[in-house]
């Protein structure tokens, strides 16, 4: 399997410092998180393109800037975030972008459906024109967004992706917290095209736990080869990241 690191963990650093920290740890692949940009709506995507090229890193995926719309008046802002993220994905030469549902879990169903249609009615055609695949992430129970389990994801996908073209970004941390790991894998295992890897609360795995082993075995059964993207809490130390990297490299030799 292919190992990658979300550079969102170094979002407080400059872009050059961010990429340097990733390289210092020995990673070759990253998921570029739009949180790494000081202002997520910044349109200067060529700065990111230049910094990535200078680093020599490969950008396998990009995590979109996110706004969980809680009122229809915010739809235009969510669309803007999505389109700027897609522009950045194109500049970084990645063909896969992770997205959230972009709607608040507090919205009534009728308004939620309306907002979903309006947001993705703009984002999906733009992504298609750029040759970028969208991948919907399962959310945590603490998230303000809608889409934490199969029932909610099915509602979202039924509105925005009836053709079944979008992928799934499987966030193991979120699935463990919502106790939806098996249900999500059973439903979406063949659509997974990115995995956000972390233990509960986005803490690093320190060993191959029974839950992790079971997940990887089942994922391997779907012939998934990566990326496995380490997405870790911001206070994870460089030493802890290095140990987690070594752990997964050891585990991957078995698959």
Q: Which stretches of residues belong to each language-model region?
A:
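Glycine/Thr-rich phosphate-binding loops of Rossmann-like dinucleotide-binding domains
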Residues: 40, 107, 144, 205, ...
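Hydrophobic residues within beta-strands of alpha/beta enzymes
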Residues: 30, 60-62, 97, 134, ...
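Catalytic-core regions built around general acid/base machinery
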Residues: 44-55, 119-126, 156, 184-187, ...
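Active-site-proximal loop/turn and secondary-structure-junction residues that shape catalytic pockets
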Residues: 9-11, 34-36, 65-68, 101-105, ...
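N-terminal pre-domain/capping segments
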Residues: 1-94, 190, 249-255
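A generic structural signal for short
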Residues: 6-7, 36-38, 73-74, 111-112, ...
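Histidine-acidic metal/acid-base catalytic patches
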Residues: 1-7, 11-26, 93-95, 147-255
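Active-site acidic/histidine proton-transfer and metal-coordination neighborhood
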Residues: 54, 71-167
């Amino acid at each position: 399997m292919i190992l990658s690191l979300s550079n969102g963990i170094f979002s407080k650093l400059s872009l050059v410092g961010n990429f340097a920290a990733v390289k210092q740890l020995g990673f070759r692949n990253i998921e570029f998180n739009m949180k790494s940009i000081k202002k997520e709506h910044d349109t200067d995507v060529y700065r990111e393109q230049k910094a990535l090229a200078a680093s020599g890193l490969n950008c396998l995926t990009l995590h979109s800037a996110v706004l969980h719309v809680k009122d229809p008046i915010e739809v235009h802002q969510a669309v803007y975030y999505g389109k700027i993220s897609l522009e950045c994905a194109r500049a970084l030469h990645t063909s896969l972008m992770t997205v959230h549902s972009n709607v608040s879990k507090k919205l009534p169903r009728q308004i939620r459906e309306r907002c979903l249609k309006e947001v993705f009615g703009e984002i999906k055609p733009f992504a298609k024109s750029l040759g970028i695949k969208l991948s919907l992430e399962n959310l945590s129970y603490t998230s303000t967004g809608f889409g934490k389990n199969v029932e909610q994801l099915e509602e979202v996908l039924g509105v925005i992706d009836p053709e079944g073209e979008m992928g799934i970004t499987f966030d193991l941390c979120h699935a463990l917290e919502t106790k939806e790991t098996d249900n999500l894998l059973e439903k979406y295992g063949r659509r997974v095209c990115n995995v956000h890897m972390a233990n509960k609360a986005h803490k690093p795995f320190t060993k191959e736990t029974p839950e992790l082993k079971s997940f990887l075995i089942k994922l391997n059964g779907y012939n998934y080869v990566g990326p496995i993207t380490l997405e870790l809490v911001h206070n994870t130390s460089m030493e802890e990241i290095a140990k987690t990297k070594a752990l997964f490299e050891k585990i991957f030799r078995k698959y």
